[in-house]
Amino acid sequence: MHADQRKKLTVLMINMFIAVGSFGIIIPILPAYLASIGQGGTAAGLMIAIFAGAQLVMSPIAGKWADQYGRRKMIIYGLIGLTLSMFVFYFSNSVTVLYISRAIGGAGAALLIPAIFAYVADITTMDQRAKGNSYVSAAMSLGIVIGPGIGGFLAEYDLKLPLLVSAIVSGAAVLFSVLLLQESEKHDATAMAPDEGSMLKKLGTSFKKPYFVPLVITLVMSFGLMAYESVLGLFVDDQFGASPKDIAIMVTSTGIISVIAQIFIVDKLSRSLGEGKVLNLFLFIAALGFLLSLLTSSYGGFFAITLVIFLATSILRPVLNTMISKLAGNEQGFAMGMNNAYMSIGNVLGPTLAGVLYDVNILYPFALGLIFLVVTFIGSFIWQKRQARLIAKVEQSS
């Protein structure tokens, strides 16, 4: 990459890091904060579902807007939405208003994330795209690692301080983007997918796209990962008697593994094997991880298996983004919006079903994730066989 590409990519990485990190700051204090206003697990679950639901509803629209009005505007508006969400969260003690803040935050994330990945597609060649997507995904993973750590530290001084700091940091990201982020030169407002009206119609339109199967894989991966994450703490506590410190170490370790994989592994694997083979390989590894999680009898073994699962998903995410981007052609905003929409569907359904199944049997969420991943692996293998010529063409593009 030349200097101008690296500069723009750095700005995008900083934005993604701040956006994800500012949300991650509130994670350690969420249970105690909800308890302080007389709320518990139901409210926590609804906050996740509302955030993901708003993201789902807005994502197709946001993708179209990114194509029509430009990536820069959507990135800035998305950051404004996240900032407003955090300020509403900080100043409110009403659970209803907190739900509203999560809806605003979800809408902001829907504007921000597809626009960032569409921007990456604009400033990179086909050959560079895997590296660009993996760097932005690494910034996301780094935010997930560092945000909660900062939140836990700030909460030692005041329970609501992480909320205020999160809002201020998000606001700084808005100013940062206004001053430093330029519109991507390849953005073409005329190169858009046709306007199909409602979100459901846009989802229907995606069925006909060449990147539909990667979108479905994105949904399944998000479903499995969020289902896994949502019961992870409960499972290691119930099954192995893990302490909060043990759980924190596990979560931090998975984030570190994700960052390392996305910076140092994804691009090399994609170049040597091609996105299609990497996709199948790590779908298989993720499924194997879910299978082993059903069989392990020790905390150490489960810890190691969890690292393997997160390693697989951290590689799958940028690989899928790259494959969708290459297959999308001039519909980058629409494609990334649909990518975010399918991811949001998984983020809503995963924790919801996992929680219900966990109350029946603590192993059922892992069994369900295994079934979904096996079916997806088989589907991906068959799809790639049928579309071998198209996939080979986009993998060889530069």
PLM-predicted stretches and their roles:
Residues 1-6, 182-215, 398:
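Juxtamembrane intracellular "pre-TM" segments in multi-pass secondary transporters
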Residues 52-60, 144-145, 255-263, 347-348:
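Residue-level signature of mid-helix packing/kink "hotspots" within the transmembrane helices
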Residues 57-93:
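Conserved MFS/SLC helix-loop-helix module at the cytosolic interface between two early adjacent transmembrane helices
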Residues 59-70, 261-274, 358:
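Helix-to-loop junctions at the C-terminal end of transmembrane segments
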Residues 276-320:
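C-terminal transmembrane helical hairpin of 12-TM major facilitator-type secondary transporters
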